[in-house]
């Protein structure tokens, strides 16, 4: 019997796959557990429509990420921090502070976990900070750290 998997089933199939399984296994386990549905022409059509919708949403998300990247690449965020001699900061600038400053100064909300800061910024001046907006899109934000007077 052909079935469409609604969830991943270990050793049998992944979500969205159409596979042939034993009739008893399908009726007594997969259908009752809500793990699969019968692969009727109507269900196959619905599956195809769902896949197309997901693909379209993914493309739109990628387009939005590219658009945001172009905007972020032109921006500079200015932060103020107390510094000692030689431009060394007392403390450091973290990804959380960068995300908050981006929100306040440019009204762009970015999750701090998307800011790929290897180490916190510990010196005055300009630093280029990569921001992963999408698995395929990474923007670069210029962060300017100035001494707080």
Curated annotation (Swiss-Prot):
<dbReference type="GO" id="GO:0005840">
    <property type="term" value="C:ribosome"/>
</dbReference>
<dbReference type="InterPro" id="IPR020594">
    <property type="entry name" value="Ribosomal_bL9_bac/chp"/>
</dbReference>
<dbReference type="GO" id="GO:0006412">
    <property type="term" value="P:translation"/>
</dbReference>
<dbReference type="GO" id="GO:1990904">
    <property type="term" value="C:ribonucleoprotein complex"/>
</dbReference>
<keyword id="KW-0689">Ribosomal protein</keyword>
<dbReference type="InterPro" id="IPR036935">
    <property type="entry name" value="Ribosomal_bL9_N_sf"/>
</dbReference>
<dbReference type="InterPro" id="IPR009027">
    <property type="entry name" value="Ribosomal_bL9/RNase_H1_N"/>
</dbReference>
<protein>
    <recommendedName>
        <fullName>Large ribosomal subunit protein bL9</fullName>
    </recommendedName>
</protein>
<dbReference type="Pfam" id="PF01281">
    <property type="entry name" value="Ribosomal_L9_N"/>
</dbReference>
<dbReference type="Pfam" id="PF03948">
    <property type="entry name" value="Ribosomal_L9_C"/>
</dbReference>
<dbReference type="InterPro" id="IPR020069">
    <property type="entry name" value="Ribosomal_bL9_C"/>
</dbReference>
<dbReference type="InterPro" id="IPR000244">
    <property type="entry name" value="Ribosomal_bL9"/>
</dbReference>
<dbReference type="GO" id="GO:0019843">
    <property type="term" value="F:rRNA binding"/>
</dbReference>
<dbReference type="GO" id="GO:0003735">
    <property type="term" value="F:structural constituent of ribosome"/>
</dbReference>
<comment type="function">
    <text>Binds to the 23S rRNA.</text>
</comment>
<keyword id="KW-0687">Ribonucleoprotein</keyword>
<dbReference type="InterPro" id="IPR020070">
    <property type="entry name" value="Ribosomal_bL9_N"/>
</dbReference>
<comment type="similarity">
    <text>Belongs to the bacterial ribosomal protein bL9 family.</text>
</comment>
<keyword id="KW-0699">rRNA-binding</keyword>
<dbReference type="InterPro" id="IPR036791">
    <property type="entry name" value="Ribosomal_bL9_C_sf"/>
</dbReference>
<keyword id="KW-0694">RNA-binding</keyword>
